A protein has these predicted regions:
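Extended, small-residue-rich solenoid/repeat segments and analogous flexible loops
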Residues: 1-31
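Flexible, glycine/small-residue-enriched loop-and-beta-strand segment within the central core
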Residues: 22-34, 39-96
Length: 96
């Protein structure tokens, strides 16, 4: 399957029988690992290190954000509702 915004070959890992919608945008595909039998629906945006275990479904319009240093891990058989925002990172503004 062809994607409009990145080359599937650039993904860190793409498991068997996984489906990625044509309009999914992945900012750092080299940091994204997708297990077997996963589905990422159209209009999803990913801009963080991501690991999807087997049988994960990300619904349409979701945003998984956090940058290169943060990570989101979705365990097997997990799912999101449409338009969910998952943000990884640390908002520690009190340091020094």
């Amino acid at each position: 399957m062809k994607n409009l915004f990145f080359n599937l070959k650039d993904l860190k890992k793409l498991g068997k029988n996984s489906i990625i919608g044509k309009t999914v945008r992945i900012r750092y595909p080299e940091l994204v690992s997708i297990g077997d039998n996963c589905i990422i629906d159209d209009f999803t945006y990913i801009s963080t290190r991501l690991e999807l275990e087997n049988n994960v479904h990300i619904s349409s319009g979701c945003k998984l954000i956090g940058g290169k240093k943060s990570q989101i891990i979705m365990k097997r058989f997990s799912t999101t509702a449409p338009n969910v925002v998952l943000a990884a990172g640390n908002d520690d503004y009190v340091s020094g």
